[in-house]
Amino acid sequence: MSVILYQPGKKLMNDFLQSIIDRDPAAKSKLSLILTYPGVKAIFFHRIANFFAKAKFNLIARIISQFSRFLTGIEIHPNANIGKNLFIDHGMGVVIGETSDIGDNVTIYHMVTLGGIAPSINSNNQRNVKRHPTIQDEVVIGSGAQVLGPVTVGRCAKIGANAVITKDVPEKAVMVGIPAKNVGLADSEFKPYGITPDSDTKKNNE
């Protein structure tokens, strides 16, 4: 999993935009992505905020992050580590916490939370520790899903809509439900907006 702190350049931007076109049939052009996709704007601002956060200009980083949240409806903490080609589709209501790590070519739909578990009364014992998820490469997280705590979601896993993840997820698993269960459908159809086909059938057969 590669993490980008700050990597400007035309090729990086072109690759990012092309990766969205490859995943979203509604994407018509790179210009339309830049002008109209909140997820693209949120990543652009996060790269800048993350640069300032790494340089210890924390107030500037938070101001940029808050402006991005106001503009896009997407909240990404400046210290979150995000790899290449993260596609936040629709975007409204997405929250990515401070110690989140996200790999390459990840897709996240609206209303997703990459959050911590309920804080203790004394927050000092949670500073400088891993509190948020690690999302490995090629993961898809469906709308409304909650991935909570310092768990790891393995490569190419798929998280169904509104699923709640509080434990590690194996590579290529398909997780649905509350609490989420692995329904073992890694090679079958997956719907990030609703119930994955045959998930109820499998559950009833267990």
What role is predicted for each listed range?
Residues N122-S123, C156, V174, S188-K191:
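Short, glycine/charged-enriched secondary-structure capping and boundary segments
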Residues S123-R131:
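Regulatory activation segment
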Residues T72, H77-P78, G83-K84, D89-E98, ...:
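Left-handed beta-helix
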Residues M1-T72, D187-E206:
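Terminal amphipathic alpha-helical/low-complexity segments used for targeting or macromolecular assembly
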Residues P38-G39, F44-R47, A80, L86, ...:
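Solvent-exposed, flexible loop/coil residues
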Residues I60, I64, T107, T113, ...:
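Extended, non-globular alpha-helical segments
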